[in-house]
Amino acid sequence: MTNIRKTHPLAKIINSSFIDLPTPSNISAWWNFGSLLGVCLILHILTGLFLAMHYTADTTTAFSSVAHICRDVNYGWVIRYMHANGASMFFICLFMHVGRGLYYGSYLFSETWNIGIILLLTIMATAFMGYVLPWGQMSFWGATVITNLLSAIPYIGTDLVEWIWGGFSVDKATLTRFFAFHFILPFIILALAMVHLLFLHETGSNNPSGISSNSDKIPFHPYYTIKDILGVLLLLLALVTLVLFSPDLLGDPDNYTPANPVSTPLHIKPEWYFLFAYAILRSIPNKLGGVLALIFSILILAIIPLLHTSKQRGMMFRPLSQCLFWLLAADLLTLTWIGGQPVEHPLVIIGQLASILYFTILLVLMPIAGIIENNLSKW
């Protein structure tokens, strides 16, 4: 009798995706982040569902309802902080996952890579709208500043901003629609993640060596299920530690002040995971130029496959490209630091230099390094 997991229409899909999936035998811990992102997403959908049961999307009661969740709902504070800090974990895993893709040349699976970019943009939009919901000072002013960037679009900009706001300022209509979108988008992300996996399983996983692993595949279960469970336990350990010991470490104190349209906070800044893009935005004095740089800082990922000049897929045996990759990582950390600082003399120029370096590494230096390494290999 054939095993039911290989014949049942539903079980067959799960079996071919998570049990009998032929997987390269040499993939490292850098390949764990895909499953960790799945865990983060499920955790978010569950905690978000329970938060939505108690939250009210109204400007007069939103702030109070979040306080009520933390004070009066059984373990509401755990749910709220798991959701908020879970977002930080989500973005750490995302950056690691994208970084792994860049390092090992996974972007040459173009369909998987492009769906991944769409996923990244959707997750960023979802996180931004979620940050607006508690209706604190930083929620309100963050929403005002970021949505206002659309007014830089010629001709239709102002109309577009007012259409998104649902009025002439960020108000009740804005909050209500942001809540509606914040609720529905994670399910769209879940569907996109399935498409992401579908395209990945068409080609099979990449591996650290960058060469075909068809001659050496092992079943996903039990080898990588065990490995993924270890990753999940470490992720949850980090998240629970953060939630129980310093839940406000990554948040902004301004968000504990109810939103006040007539009082602007001293430094308006987004959550830490958007600071690198915010620094790039601020480093260009022109509004439209800044917005374009902000958008291109993410969309640049889409042209990475076109800029691949090396004969080798990954960077495992390419020391020059490795140096540039880690320089890029350091540059992104610098941008993250600058994004959280006030706009003052030495910091502005550091931000501008870091922004120029970011685009130069990706657009110019890495393709050149690939060509140099191709020629070096002939010696």
UniProtKB/Swiss-Prot annotation:
InterPro entries: Cyt_b/b6_C, Cyt_b/b6_C_sf, Cyt_b/b6_N, Cytb/b6-like_sf, Cytochrome_b, Cytochrome_b_C_euk/bac, Cytochrome_b_N_euk/bac, Di-haem_cyt_TM. The keyword Protease does not apply. PROSITE patterns: CYTB_CTER, CYTB_NTER. One of its GO terms (molecular function) is metal ion binding. Its main location: mitochondrion. It is a multi-pass membrane protein. Heme b b566 binds at residues 97, 196. Signal peptide: none annotated. It is found in: Mitochondrion inner membrane. A ubiquinone binds at residue 201. Heme b b562 binds at residues 83, 182. Pfam families: Cytochrom_B_C, Cytochrome_B. The chain crosses the membrane at residues 33-53, 77-98, 113-133, 178-198, 226-246, 288-308, 320-340, 347-367. The cytochrome bc1 complex contains 11 subunits: 3 respiratory subunits (MT-CYB, CYC1 and UQCRFS1), 2 core proteins (UQCRC1 and UQCRC2) and 6 low-molecular weight proteins (UQCRH/QCR6, UQCRB/QCR7, UQCRQ/QCR8, UQCR10/QCR9, UQCR11/QCR10 and a cleavage product of UQCRFS1). This cytochrome bc1 complex then forms a dimer. Belongs to the cytochrome b family. Component of the ubiquinol-cytochrome c reductase complex (complex III or cytochrome b-c1 complex) that is part of the mitochondrial respiratory chain. The b-c1 complex mediates electron transfer from ubiquinol to cytochrome c. Contributes to the generation of a proton gradient across the mitochondrial membrane that is then used for ATP synthesis. Heme 1 (or BL or b562) is low-potential and absorbs at about 562 nm, and heme 2 (or BH or b566) is high-potential and absorbs at about 566 nm. This is Cytochrome b.
